[in-house]
């Protein structure tokens, strides 16, 4: 098939990154009309033609700082780690997360399972950016996304990197174009930005921006896709890594589209300190706590855009597991529900089949003993309109479900599933108040069609 995009019941799914995406009307609201971007960072999106079928759309993204950055990243746990993952890990290890200047990303080819030659290609991409920055030492992180098992057209990419560097810009349009350049089957670019303050400098404004991509092969086991976060706050790399790890565990590590973990998953953050102020160096400082809250909330909002763009998805579902003795057990239960094909297909079919949710809770592996007790487990649907929860199961006893109300709730795009492991208010029956939240989407006919045609 020679066409660049495939239409699936109104969803245009691109297999490289189009500049003039036919974004579905329902997704237009997620595209920012403006932004507040961190000082000292500039970006570009450039056409290379990584895939032969892409004759004009940007598929090479470059994010660069005028000054050296502290950097941190989290990577996929898939055993078949892609060449760019290996290259970026090596760069961070060699630099100890200091002095990083850029991130370069191509879409259209994952450069995964490509052997020694693939690793050399990834290293050469970073080296070419370093050359453009006038640097001899490795200072660029590399990411790739696309089809696994194919070599990059590396000569074409290396030839275009100087163009990408010469067109770096800090405008909103440039940030949006760059976010578009990393898309594959995404139906819209995923870009957010915000301002914040820190306790030590209450009158100083800091900025945080981030872009991510992903719509399929999304289920975390340390990261879930590609993402780059940039801030002009001063943060030492020793503090940046735990900040990112915490944020990812409660955001990109808490989403699922289809239960698959990619070979290329990488989330990176760069902090250049361009806004000034006292550097965050201690994990026990007030600034660190404030930054942790800002970064985690921001990462949650950014990661949720991936779920909202899940391949073939018609629903955005929050599953909240509460009244657990520990966070990890609650997270495992939420994760199991989120990746259950039976739960996901029931939601697509607008079927209030709570038995499938209960089944997923019951077979969850790795939870602390005594966490799941049928006689104190409750399940309910929580409507987005703020009305009362629809109770499905209370203390292990099924409720007489109002099917008409259930149908109304399930008709909505957004839905929350609440699982209470204590059967009542937090803290009852000797349990703690630990809670975990996961975000996921449903499974539809379109998901099968999209992925059945992925390489065509």
From Swiss-Prot:
The record marks 223-224 as: Cleavage. Its main location: mitochondrion. It comes from the Eukaryota. The keyword Oxidoreductase does not apply. Gene3D superfamilies: arginine biosynthesis bifunctional protein suprefamily, ArgJ beta chain, C-terminal domain, L-amino peptidase D-ALA esterase/amidase. InterPro entries: Arg_biosynth_ArgJ (IPR002813), ArgJ-like_dom_sf (IPR016117), ArgJ_beta_C (IPR042195). GO terms for molecular function: glutamate N-acetyltransferase activity; L-glutamate N-acetyltransferase activity. Its EC number is 2.3.1.35, 2.3.1.1. It is found in: Mitochondrion matrix. This protein may be expected to contain an N-terminal transit peptide but none has been predicted. Heterodimer of an alpha and a beta chain. This is Arginine biosynthesis bifunctional protein ArgJ, mitochondrial. It comes from Aspergillus niger (strain ATCC MYA-4892 / CBS 513.88 / FGSC A1513).
